[in-house]
Amino acid sequence: MTLSFTAHWHDELPGFYTALNPTPLKNARLIWHNASLANDLGVPASLFQPETGAGVWGGETLLPGMHPLAQVYSGHQFGVWAGQLGDGRGILLGEQQLENGHTVDWHLKGAGLTPYSRMGDGRAVLRSTIRESLASEAMHALGIPTSRALSIVTSDTQVARESMEQGAMLMRIAQSHVRFGHFEHFYYRREPEKVRQLADFVIEHHWPQWQNDADKYVLWFQDVVARTASLMACWQTVGFAHGVMNTDNMSILGLTIDYGPYGFLDDYQPDFICNHSDYQGRYSFENQPAVGLWNLQRLAQSLSPFIAVEALNDALDRYQDVLMQEYGKLMRRKLGLMTQEKGDNDILNALFALMSREGSDYTRTFRMLGQTEKHSAASPLRDEFIDRQGFDSWFATYRARLQREETPDDARNAHMNAVNPAMVLRNWLAQRAIDQAEQGDYAELHRLHDALRTPFNDRDDDYVSRPPDWGKRLEVSCSS
């Protein structure tokens, strides 16, 4: 199969980017590639052979049809208008045309200086590229909309962060890299015609069913609201904290993008802050749904020159309903409830209150809940709690609720095990792989990637054990 690339952004949106080539690293070498994703994309195995060098993965060559460019956008960061931002370290190499008619972006992170690098050096480090590759593939395996990682290249280039680190590149694959901040950029530059031009572009390429509809802009924004609300519900369900939900990190397609100081919950603490630069807790785990709406409000403001304010507000008013409907559906599945009753939220909230008081492990608690037998008063989860009386009280209510379900125990438990992962990407697991990779040993990186592909499978290794004390509630740097 020959890879085919289009250049829609390059050809249709002049003034939205700067064309430039990647800047290769010193002695770049491929250390990991995503064979499964490569197969899905039809990427020839020969491109990953050691004798071919870093090639396109290290920005040393381009594939036919690629027109590399850096996109310009702006955004609100931590609630404050930050002005022009843009691709400061990444370059959109091209858009691959797939056999099903869709396209995907090939975006090279760490590709060197661009006009939008500001005070940065245009580079990424091995630590951050490993973290993004692990997180994006973990989220994909959990069924959450996300960008993907295709390859990692390391090098002898030294990059200054808190300390000197190895320069690296990551090939990111996504349906689109359009962010809320793309629209904000031209709105604040008082160029509403370009905001509309970009809206027309994304509708044509990602919502073609509405391209000729008189209400296409309203229908499109309504769907952006719904996708964002659904994504927030997914994050909350699996215990994922993004850490830096600036408007320039919000995907117009409702994808999880820009993995930086993220973290999955260990102990259930709703105020968990994974980003050590988030001093006020703006992007804490429990605040994410509210921030999602705030970011949509900023997007709506940017679209107000050509969408009526009333229509924008009507769409925004649907956010909470979509969020709670999707979240409720997902959490009922985690509880093994196939039907819906009025008191289901009370059961869930009582469990969360108990978990929060005890610092119960979020992932392990729900996984073990899948071993419940509705006609047995015993639960293997009981030994996980110090407050046995509190657990017994909650479990009696939960078991009574299960008894009103017709689904047999074995079928319900199998269903629960298909939605409650045995394994998530805990920060300490990622850090262990990073530490070894920085010493030139990539075996753990490969092992961890392999394990993350099947998060719902039972395991008996430390990938599913409680984190060590040093690994709990890790806060991570924004630096990449």
From Swiss-Prot:
Give one GO term, molecular function aspect. Answer: AMPylase activity
Question: Which branch of life, at top level?
Answer: Bacteria
Q: EC number(s) in its UniProt entry?
A: 2.7.7.-, 2.7.7.108
Catalytic reaction annotation: L-seryl-[protein] + ATP = 3-O-(5'-adenylyl)-L-seryl-[protein] + diphosphate; L-threonyl-[protein] + ATP = 3-O-(5'-adenylyl)-L-threonyl-[protein] + diphosphate; L-tyrosyl-[protein] + ATP = O-(5'-adenylyl)-L-tyrosyl-[protein] + diphosphate; L-histidyl-[protein] + UTP = N(tele)-(5'-uridylyl)-L-histidyl-[protein] + diphosphate
Signal peptide location in the record? none
EC primary class? transferase
State the needed cofactors, names only.
Answer: Mg(2+); Mn(2+)
Where are the active-site residues found?
Answer: 248 (proton acceptor)
Annotated ATP binding lies at 86, 88-89, 109, 121-122, 172, 179, 258
Q: Which InterPro entries match?
A: adnlytase_SelO, SelO
Keywords recorded for this protein, A-Z: ATP-binding, Magnesium, Manganese, Metal-binding, Nucleotide-binding, Nucleotidyltransferase, Transferase
Q: Where does Mg(2+) bind?
A: 249, 258
Against HAMAP family, the record matches this protein to:
YdiU_SelO
Q: Which NCBIfam families match?
A: adnlytase_SelO (NF040880), PRK00029.1 (NF000658)
UniProt lists the family membership as follows: Belongs to the SELO family.
Q: What does this protein do?
A: Nucleotidyltransferase involved in the post-translational modification of proteins. It can catalyze the addition of adenosine monophosphate (AMP) or uridine monophosphate (UMP) to a protein, resulting in modifications known as AMPylation and UMPylation.
Which protein are we looking at? Protein nucleotidyltransferase YdiU
Q: Which organism is it from?
A: Enterobacter sp. (strain 638)
Gene field? ydiU
